[in-house]
Regions:
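Short Gly/aromatic-enriched secondary-structure transition segments
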Residues: 38-42
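N-terminal acidic leader/helix
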Residues: 2-37
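Mixed-charge, Lys/Arg-enriched low-complexity segments
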Residues: 43-81
């Protein structure tokens, strides 16, 4: 797996990898991460098409999902302690 690109974002780290004819978009925020696999066959303009997928609407959804994930993890952690 090799790093193709890292995109700046104020709230999280976005990395794009290439592995086995797939692009893997990894988005990290603190201890949490989300990853998305996209077949190279499904997009027409290589990594540039991946950049286009990462629009503001998608990133807003990612932000909301991180909040949900954090809440879920905190609840599980509190049940443990």
């Amino acid at each position: 797996m090799r790093v193709i690109a890292e995109l700046p974002h104020p709230d999280f780290k976005i990395s794009i990898f290439s592995m086995n004819q797939k692009f893997i978009v990894k988005i990290e925020r603190g201890i949490l991460e989300q990853s998305y696999k996209i077949s190279e066959m499904d997009i027409t303009d290589g990594v540039n098409s991946v950049f286009e997928l990462l629009d503001e609407e998608f990133l807003a959804t990612v932000t909301a999902r991180f909040k949900e994930m954090g809440s879920d993890f905190k609840s599980a952690y509190n049940r443990y302690n």
